[in-house]
A protein has these predicted regions:
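Short glycine-enriched loop/turn motifs at secondary-structure junctions
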Residues: 2-4, 58-62, 102-103
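Hydrophobic adenine-recognition pocket in adenosine-nucleotide-binding enzymes
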Residues: 8, 65
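Core segments of cupin and vicinal oxygen chelate
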Residues: 9-48, 54
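Vicinal oxygen chelate
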Residues: 15-16, 66-114, 118, 126-129
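Exposed loop/turn and edge beta-strand positions of beta-sandwich/beta-sheet ligand-binding modules
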Residues: 34, 63, 105
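Short, charged/polar surface micro-motifs in flexible loops or helix N-caps
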Residues: 44-47, 56-59, 70-75
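Conserved beta-strand in the GNAT
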Residues: 48-51, 110, 119-122
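A short, sequence-level motif marking secondary-structure junctions
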Residues: 52-57, 126
Length: 132
């Protein structure tokens, strides 16, 4: 079986601002619009398609998005978090503010986008790298 994750829609209040925030924080580019969507594409070809959610602020279901990054990209991403003065945590429950975690011998950090989605940067997958 060959199954690959292709895309997901990220609900937001302002597609252009939200896509640009993610692109800036991840060191990526916002792609050309596709219908009502503004895509941000990661290295494996998966797109995060930003679309304005109908309704009010309370209507956007927030989600958690984790990105496995290199040590160098973690450093760059963490620097962007600090440059913007964003709050960040070492855990998904926002209990360890101002810390990064060192789970499985790597580093990880959580922060929120303007829509309340939790973004995570981590350098080692949870459970560690599979043994060859």
């Amino acid at each position: 079986v060959s199954i690959h994750f292709n895309h997901t829609i990220v609900a937001c209040h302002d597609a252009a601002a939200s896509a640009q925030f993610w692109a800036d924080m991840l060191g990526l580019e916002v792609g050309p619009p596709y219908g009502p969507f503004l895509p941000v594409t990661v290295d494996n070809g998966v797109t995060f398609d930003f679309a304005v959610a109908p309704g009010t602020v309370q209507d956007i279901p927030t989600a958690h998005y984790a990105f496995l990054v290199s040590e160098e990209d973690f450093d760059k991403g963490f620097a962007r978090i600090q440059e913007r003065g964003l709050r960040y945590w070492a855990d998904p429950h926002a209990q360890r503010e101002g810390e990064i975690n060192h789970n499985d011998g790597g580093r990880g950090v959580y922060f929120f986008d303007p829509n309340g989605h939790a973004l995570e940067l981590l350098t080692v997958p949870y459970g560690g790298w599979p043994e060859s």
